[in-house]
Amino acid sequence: MKHIRIIATLVLMAVLSSASVAQMVSPVDFMRYNPRALNANPAFYTTDYGFFDLMLGGYNIGVQNIGLKYDKFFRFNAAGQPTVLDLDKGVASLRDKNYLNTYINVDIFNCGRRTKHGYFTYSHRFRELESLSYNKDLVKLLANGNAAFLGENNPADINIGVSARAFQEFAFGYQMSLTEQWNIGLRLKFLMGFMDAKTNAMNVKLYTDPETYALKLMTTANVQATLPYEFVMEDGKMKIVDRRFNPATLFKNYGLGVDLGGEYIINEHWGVAAALNDLGFIKWNNHSVNFVGEINDGGSFYDNGAFVFTGLTNEQVQAIMDDEHFADHLMDSLTGYFNLTPQNVAGYTTGLYTNLMVRGYYDLDATNRFSAQFMGYNLGMGMKPAVTLAYTGSFKEQYDVVATYTMMPGSFDNLGIGLSANFGGLLMYVATNNIFGFFNPANRTNLNVQFGISFTSGEKVSRAETIIIQDQAAEGE
């Protein structure tokens, strides 16, 4: 049963832990005087001569829930208090495929400096992402039982997907102004994996006989994982050898990634930008295992690869109620039908959660900018689109005020705000992609907060001045 508990732990991590995603939409992405905007587009032009931060530079924490909502499962009185639990209403509100995602990015160290050849950056970040997907049939079965699947809905067809990943990222970036209109950017990433888990398949079919009400259960499960602890296989079971984490093992889970970006200023009012982030892979070599699930022939309930339950006799029911040892023995017998076999594997490769960003903007004047952006982002369960409209107010080359509105599948109430201020070289910022999430989190799709402190140095450098410096450097060579 230990390997089953390990699988359950991995699933629980996907539901409860924090995690980081490939770049999510944030008001910080639209700031003009905050070098953190480089995270969204490596071609972003920063007027700062240099910046650095240690541990306090950036935290991005959030939850995305496209599925279960508190207010969908209750009826409320005139005072707004829940009075009746309405499971049918809650199930009807669900999509065919639902998601629960959590993420966290922690910037450990960042720095950047302008030279005569361009702008160079370095960053060290810890990133983590967990994503759980589930279909409506899972909640419907839990809420209404198997009776809800008689007739044309037979069988209950349950699909669950889990994706969990944690790694460190070391990134070297370069941004260059080709002309006063063209900016390009490149960021190379070296990755060190901590842990990974993903379901290649997790399906349960529960068929109810319309006449006898006998239950027929068929399962398919395949989970690949890389664990942070050393383990050995003994008698077909996985045993953790040492629960102490060894940092040297990080070098065995290695990867490479790249971010590409560009910006073109059409005229004094209009501009466009695009970026492709997190294009790459991680090779998981350390403590890798593959779990394969199937129905075992454990006795009379087994039938051609399925578990068939026709009920208990009156004597068995009475024995369960009267004899604790009999009940324990029966449960052990039933669990013998369900097997998750761990298989030691040499390793496997996973791609990063790549995302594409395309943006257009209009500068009313030097202070006010209006933007429209499309982003296709990946949470480990496929590419999802997000469309964002944004306003940026930038003042005195020190302050940014940003308001965003983002639409994505199943979520249309995302109003974000962001503030950034530079006080004599001390830059502080705070932002959220959905201010409503703080007032009613149980009923919101997104809950997010992003904040940090950096130190900037040197005089501000305009694009025109940068071009002159780069041209002079080229002539000198």
Which residues fall in each region the model found?
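Solvent-exposed loop/turn segments connecting transmembrane beta-strands
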Residues: 31-36, 350-354, 365-369, 373-388, ...
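Outer-membrane beta-barrel channels and translocator barrels
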Residues: 47, 115-118, 179-181, 267, ...
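Transmembrane beta-strands of outer-membrane beta-barrel proteins
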Residues: 52-55, 120-122, 184-188, 272-275, ...
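Transmembrane beta-strands of outer-membrane beta-barrel pores
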Residues: 58-62, 126-130, 190-194, 276-283, ...
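Residues on the lipid-exposed face of transmembrane beta-strands in outer-membrane beta-barrel proteins
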Residues: 42-44, 104-113, 122, 170-178, ...
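Residues that define the transmembrane beta-barrel architecture of outer-membrane proteins
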Residues: 36-38, 102-107, 164-170, 254-258, ...
